Amino acid sequence: MYQRDCTTITQHAMSTPDGLYDIIEFTLCTINMPLSRVIQQRVSIKAEGIQSKWVSGTKALGIEYAKANAQRLHAAINEIADLHGKDTIDGAQEAVDLFVSIPSIGMVKAGFIAQMCGFQVACLDRHNIRMLGLAETALVLNKKVKPDLRRSKIRSYVKLCR
């Protein structure tokens, strides 16, 4: 079931800008929220947009950015897949780097979006981080750091996921 569902999700995300937007919005809805509440949020967002009670200011920025940039993000993620492959460290690093540009999306959630696009990376939650003996802050990425440091931290995260 896992492989079947992952394949379906990847096809949805990579086929159209709307499909990619869909998984980005889904990811935004999972931030600090149990999965059981995601459907409720998505229904509300579809009906009320960023005026939904579920949408905070930062989540609204992410939703608006993803909507406005869906075509560019979709073209970029497909270009990354074509250039680097989905099963390489370079491909996963580039995918995560692309998605951290979305407001409200940190490195871990960017990994989740990239994973749903078929790249070999994941979304390591607090429980996984603790099991690995790392501090939760180890995976926090300051988006204002220099590009070389950002890319290095993303690459380390991708390797950790493998």
Where do the model's predicted regions map?
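C-terminal accessory module of base-excision DNA glycosylases/AP lyases that mediates lesion recognition
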Residues: 1-12, 18, 70-78, 89-162
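Short helix-capping/linker segments at secondary-structure and domain boundaries
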Residues: 31-41, 80-86, 119, 136
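Structure-specific DNA junction-binding interface
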Residues: 1-64
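Alpha-helical ds-nucleic-acid-binding substructure associated with the helix-hairpin-helix region
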Residues: 40-103
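Short, amphipathic alpha-helical segments that act as regulatory/interfacial helices
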Residues: 24-33, 74-81, 158
